[in-house]
Regions:
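Domain-scale recognition of functional cores that engage charged ligands
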Residues: 1-170
Length: 170
């Protein structure tokens, strides 16, 4: 009987608020059975907060000369995989061909990821998405089809994109 082993890497995107705590949790729990070199922490940058739909900068209520910032968000993961060299390293050192993303707010989709990767491979897709139903008012992003209001009676072209929860009406 022959056995094969494979290296399954895991990248965790952290924020300045969660990075040290995430690293401590991994170390205190011996990386939950993973090898330390399997786990890559990627620290996302902070960006300016917007106060409204007109993209006004949000100012600190205690200091009008200080702009409020927040972690860049889920979309930063692609830039971080590139800028940190993580995707290139995985491809060159481990032969990684597919990267699956799941968010802490979408863990129920995790079980569907192997099937989704299989479909992407079979159909030769460059990308595939898995989504789960959302309820109005949930503080989590969603895939949404955005269609402009019909002002002139003409058929409007829509756009399917990931939308942050604070941009959706309940």
């Amino acid at each position: 009987s022959s056995s094969t082993s494979s290296f399954l890497p895991l990248a965790i995107m952290t924020s300045p608020d969660t990075h040290a705590k995430t690293l401590a949790l991994l170390e205190e729990n011996a990386y939950f059975g993973l090898q330390k070199q399997q786990v890559t922490l990627m620290l996302q940058e902070r960006v300016a907060c917007l106060a409204d739909g007109s993209a006004s900068l949000a100012l600190d209520p205690t200091d009008a000369f200080q702009i409020l910032t927040k972690p860049h968000g889920h979309g930063d993961v692609h830039a971080l995989l590139h800028s940190t060299g993580t995707a290139k390293k995985w491809a060159e050192q481990h032969g990684t061909r597919w990267i699956a993303f799941f968010q802490d707010t979408n863990v129920q989709a995790f079980r569907a990821l192997p099937a989704a990767i299989g479909v992407a491979e079979l159909k030769n897709y460059a990308m595939i998405s898995v989504a789960v139903p959302r309820r109005a008012g949930e503080a989590i992003g969603a895939l949404a089809r955005l269609v402009p209001k019909e002002g002139d009676g003409k058929q409007q072209k829509g756009l399917t994109i990931n939308v942050e929860y604070n941009q959706l009406d309940p």
